[in-house]
Amino acid sequence: MHNKQLLLAHRGYSFIAPENTKLAFDLAFEYCFDGIELDVHLTKDEQLVIIHDETTLRTALVNKEVEFESLVSLKRDDHSAFFHLKIQFQSILTLKEFLDLYLDKFKLINIEIKTDQKPYLGIEKKLVDLVKGYGKKAIDKILFSSFNFESLQKVYDLDNSYKKGFLFWTKKQFETISTARIQKICQFLHPWTKIYEKYPQMIKKLNLPLNLWTVNSQNKFQQFLADNHVYAQIANKKFEIKIN
């Protein structure tokens, strides 16, 4: 489907740095990943912040629910606290801080809208309003994904300029949304690697390029590299093409 698959750093270079932090994103650039996959939630004061979970407990070791905290409150905590090595303090980033720093550095930025557990009312409009400020560059480089198809529908309704990918990790999730609707709204599918390997024909029949997550071994990387349905592989580690 294209000449060169992309390799996206899953929450930044999260194998060697704390996920979704500036350090992880800096290292993804230094190690020449093609792009970044990251997760976005909405704070009490309606700031778009980059974190995977709905709470800060796992990463900052302080139990705060993102939707009930202000940005100032969340900025106080060190999101490298969970990491197995001592490193410099890593403050939670806003999406704007990230885009200002990294939009120019990567080919593709995959923003996962984390509305599968909490609705975060209005998050889609805030996302579209923010990325519009970056003009054509954002249209070229930004891809929104979500397990919640309604969030992708909302982005489509607000502004259909931006790429969208449907995330799923079960057959049931995939079959809940009609093929026609997926093909209308989305330019990509984002299946879990194991579900893709189990039901390849079911997924390929939509004829949409695939962004696979999460690729964890060199062998799998090489295997998917030979699959012309795959547009990008999303991985915690950096893999290189090996020529036998």
Curated annotation (Swiss-Prot):
Q: Which InterPro entries match?
A: GP_PDE_dom (IPR030395), PLC-like_Pdiesterase_TIM-brl (IPR017946)
Is Lipoprotein a UniProt keyword of this protein?
no
GO terms (BP aspect)? lipid metabolic process
The UniProt entry, under PROSITE patterns, shows: GP_PDE
UniProt keyword annotation of NADP present: no
SUPFAM superfamilies on file:
PLC-like phosphodiesterases
Task: Give all residue intervals belonging to the GP-PDE domain.
Answer: 5-244
List the Pfam families hit by this protein, alphabetically.
GDPD (PF03009)
A molecular function annotated in GO for this UniProt entry is: phosphoric diester hydrolase activity
Keyword set for this entry? Hydrolase
Family named by the database record: To glycerophosphoryl diester phosphodiesterases (EC 3.1.4.46).
Q: What is this protein called?
A: Uncharacterized protein MG293
Q: Which organism is it from?
A: Mycoplasma genitalium (strain ATCC 33530 / DSM 19775 / NCTC 10195 / G37) (Mycoplasmoides genitalium)
